[in-house]
UniProtKB/Swiss-Prot annotation:
EC number: 1.1.1.100, 1.6.5.10
Binding site for NADP(+): 11-14, 34-35, 56, 83-85, 147, 151, 180-182
Gene designation: Cbr4
Residues the record lists as N6-acetyllysine modifications: K40, K96, K194
Residue positions binding substrate: S134
PANTHER family (UniProt xref): 3-OXOACYL-[ACYL-CARRIER-PROTEIN] REDUCTASE, SHORT-CHAIN DEHYDROGENASES/REDUCTASES FAMILY MEMBER
Name of the protein this chain belongs to: 3-oxoacyl-[acyl-carrier-protein] reductase
Record-linked Gene3D superfamilies: NAD(P)-binding Rossmann-like Domain
Family named by the database record: Belongs to the short-chain dehydrogenases/reductases (SDR) family.
Cellular location(s): Mitochondrion matrix
Pathway assigned in UniProt: Lipid metabolism; fatty acid biosynthesis
Gene Ontology CC annotation, any one: oxidoreductase complex
Taxonomic path: Eukaryota, Metazoa, Chordata, Craniata, Vertebrata
PROSITE patterns found in the cross-reference section: ADH_SHORT
Amino acid sequence: MDKVCAVFGGSRGIGRAVAQLMAQKGYRLAIVSRNLEVAKVTAGELGGNHLAFRCDVAKEQDVQSTFQEMEKHLGPVNFLVNAAGINRDSLLVRTKTEDMISQLHTNLLGSMLTCKAAMKTMIQQGGSIVNVGSIIGLKGNVGQSAYSATKGGLVGFSRSLAKEVARKKIRVNVVAPGFIRTDMTRHLKEEHFKKNIPLGRFGETLEVAHAVVFLLESPYITGHVLIVDGGLQLTV
């Protein structure tokens, strides 16, 4: 199988787990991260002909150059996963403007830029995109107003794009995780939060990755938001 999957934010967390599953299925991976050395380690661990690329998704020129390099060395991108994201928890009245902007640029603008760049080849051949959102973007949370805005915006963007490009055989979906064991949740006390999760625990990155891969490969699903949260949305 020579289809190419680009995973932005693929060097760690959910993105890394997605890359592992897609590699096992025989796809060629482009592991994209702001830290090239970490991306190279991840690509090397996958084995085979997988490559690492450096990109700051908030910078349009970076994104465009990265897609050019991926196409040059791997071929046209068939699957795109946007898993790069940051969070700066704070009550709105205490949130620095620069923290709002950085979250908007990485979590929302970054995915918009990568999707736009992917369209250049996907319009000709079709493709599948999964943007990693968050249950916070659907339900909101105290101290995460800016983060919630970026992830909620990602849902609106993804659904609109799905309508725009469906006739070109391009599918766009969102996976919205709840509390998942990643670097972003490392500081949280699981014992405190899991009592509100019907399944009684935080999720694993691989569990979210299975949902991402399902949407990537499902030929008749587009514009969908798949919640992977252990039932958390039932209680909030």
